[in-house]
Each structure stands twice: as C-alpha cells, then as structure tokens.
C-alpha cells in the first residue's frame, strides 16, 4: 500500500475502514476497506479529518479482492445463476429460476481448502426460488497473488460448482392400493394430498386408479399409466411388511429397475423408488399422507428436475434424515434432508 493526499485519491482503493463520528447520531465505518474513492467522497473524507489515505498500490501479479471475487464467482456459478456486483470484496450468487440446487461438494471442499479464499453456499439437492441467494464468494485479505487464484481454479476443475436445474411440470399418475379403499370401506385421503403437493410445482394428475391388494392388478395399472404418457407414477399404500401389502412386488413385476426399497429417513423409511424405461415409479408409505414433511418432499424436487436418484443418494440421507416434527414447519430452512 502507499500513502497519498486525499485530494489525489479518486479512483484509488482504500486499504482500511474509515470511521465517521457524528455526535448523537452515528458512529461507524463511513467507508469500508476496498472502497473505490469517488469524487463526491473527497469533501466527506476531509470533513472527518482525513488529509491523507492509505490506498492499494497496483502491482503485477497481485489482485484486488473484487477481482479475486470475480474469479471465484466464475468458478462457482453455473446454469441458471447470476452474480451481484462486487461489494466489499464479495459477490453473491442468485438463482435465475425456480429449481433444484446442485452442488459439486468435492469441488467446493477443494476450493475452501485453498488458503485465503472461500465460497459459502446453502445446502444442495433442495428446492430454490427465483431470486434466492445461493452462495457468496470472497478472498480473506484485501489483495492476493494471482498464483493462488490459479491454484483455486485448478482445484475447482472445469465444471461450475453450483447449478440450478429448472423444474419441469409433469403429468403424473396415482395408483391407490388397498382393499379397504377399493371396497369402499374408507375414503381415499391419500390422493388429494399428492395432488396438492404436485400442484405446488405446476403438475397435473392425468391418471388415477384404485386397486385392491392383488399384485397383478397393481402391475397392470402401472403399465397402463405409463402407456398413457404419465411422466411420474406414484403408488399409495401397501408398502409395509404386512402379508397383504404387495405393492413392492407389483412394482418389481413391471420390469422397473428398483433403486431402493427402504430409506434412512423418518418419516419415510418404507419408501421405494424405481425407474421403468426412464419413468420414475415410486411406492409411497402411509406417512406421506399424514406427516407434514417426509422423504417424498426431499425427493420430489429431484424427480421434477430430472435429476436421477441413486442408491447412494438415498443412503446419504441418513445424516439429516430425521424430521423433528416441529410445531411450526420451516422446511427447507431446517436440518431435515440436509447432508
């Protein structure tokens, strides 16, 4: 840094905060470290006794924090994400659309293990809204060597660390199972719950059928729904270990690839996810009907963003997989589903 007269500081970058005190009104930083001095700032600086200033001296191979933040932003921001203007050395990443936030956790860790820089993000694999803040980038010092930023870019890799996958409204099917509903002994209260949850994402139910506990009938209904063009197929009921619960067998008999039957999530341990020629077929346990949030809420955004679900993905849900059933639900702004 170098010391210059305040009148000569226009366009220069401050190396430290400058405090202003107005008795009875204000005491705090009037100008922050990293601020670029403007012509209108000169009278203010002089009025608070700053005849001289320490400013950053541009040197080859040394980057200012705003320049470094821009490089971090470039490494981090992918599809459907834009950045704010640099402010105090920080750039924030913002979602351009409603969708699913995906984070390359290994790349994020690699960047944050690089000395003197950071990217702080919200949790991935959860729904985000257009305009929502996703992450922030900055370096720790005011200036940094170009070679350190080169090391960061090498650690980050060639692909963006964060992407937002847009949601795609889909036609879906609900196949209600259980002799108690099929024979009219109780009302189907499951289907309206699903219709409501899917409507939040602009989806429409285009197929619905009620079956008894005969696996062959459930299998036929699933295949019929797929032939009708349904892009998501949900079966309700029949997912436990009771002898009359045959829905998992029915799904298997369609020829679908079973990704997992069972998940380390409560509520939602008896969940089943499979793919039938690329179409998701999910067996939903009864908790989806009565619990505020379940594994269904964790995975539905991924299904609507066409993000393939693997057995490892399900296994990872064990950390953060316990819903506390709070009196006032704040999901996804809570620990449920965060791993």
Where are each of the predicted segments found?
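Short, low-complexity N-terminal leaders and the immediately following helix N-cap/first helix
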Residues: 1-88
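Solvent-exposed alpha-helices and their adjacent loops that cap or buttress functional pockets
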Residues: 7-11, 29, 83-86, 126-128, ...
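C-terminal terminal segments
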Residues: 29, 33, 85, 100-118, ...
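Residue-level recognition of short, solvent-exposed, well-ordered loop/turn junctions
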Residues: 32, 38, 43, 123, ...
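Flexible, glycine/charged-enriched surface loops at secondary-structure junctions
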Residues: 55-56, 81-86, 144-146, 204-208, ...
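Extended, charged alpha/beta regions that create polyanion-binding interfaces
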Residues: 59-167
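Glycine-rich phosphate/diphosphate-binding loop of Rossmann-like nucleotide-binding domains
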Residues: 158-213, 217
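Short glycine/threonine-rich loop/turn motifs
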Residues: 179, 189, 206-335
């Amino acid at each position: 840094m170098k010391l210059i007269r305040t009148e000569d500081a226009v366009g220069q970058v401050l190396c430290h905060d400058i405090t202003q005190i107005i008795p009875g009104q204000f005491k705090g930083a009037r100008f922050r470290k990293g601020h670029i001095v403007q012509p209108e700032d000169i009278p203010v600086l002089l009025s608070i006794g700053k005849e001289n200033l320490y400013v950053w001296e541009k040197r080859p191979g040394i980057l200012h924090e705003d320049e470094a933040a821009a490089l971090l932003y470039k490494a981090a921001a992918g599809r459907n994400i834009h950045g704010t203007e640099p402010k105090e050395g920080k750039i924030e990443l913002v979602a351009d659309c409603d969708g699913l936030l995906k984070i390359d956790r290994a790349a994020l860790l690699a960047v944050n293990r690089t000395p003197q820089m950071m990217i702080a993000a919200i949790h991935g694999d959860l729904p985000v809204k257009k305009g929502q803040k996703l992450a922030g980038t900055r370096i720790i010092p005011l200036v940094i060597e170009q070679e350190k930023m080169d090391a960061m870019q090498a650690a980050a890799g060639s692909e963006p660390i964060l992407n937002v996958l847009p949601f795609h409204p889909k036609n879906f099917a609900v196949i209600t199972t259980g002799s108690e509903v099929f024979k009219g002994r109780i009302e189907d209260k499951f289907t309206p719950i699903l219709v409501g949850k899917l409507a939040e994402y602009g989806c429409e139910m285009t197929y619905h059928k009620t079956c008894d506990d005969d696996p062959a009938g459930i299998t036929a209904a699933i295949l019929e729904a797929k032939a009708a063009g349904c892009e998501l197929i949900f079966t309700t009921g029949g997912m436990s270990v009771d002898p009359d619960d045959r829905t998992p067998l029915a799904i298997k008999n369609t020829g679908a690839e079973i990704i997992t039957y069972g998940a380390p999530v409560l509520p939602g341990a008896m969940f089943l996810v499979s793919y039938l020629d690329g179409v998701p077929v999910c067996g939903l346990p009864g908790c989806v009907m009565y619990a505020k949030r379940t594994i269904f809420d964790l995975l539905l955004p991924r299904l609507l963003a066409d993000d393939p679900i693997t057995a490892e993905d399900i296994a990872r849900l064990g950390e953060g997989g316990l819903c506390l059933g709070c009196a006032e639900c704040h999901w996804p702004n809570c620990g449920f589903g965060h791993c």
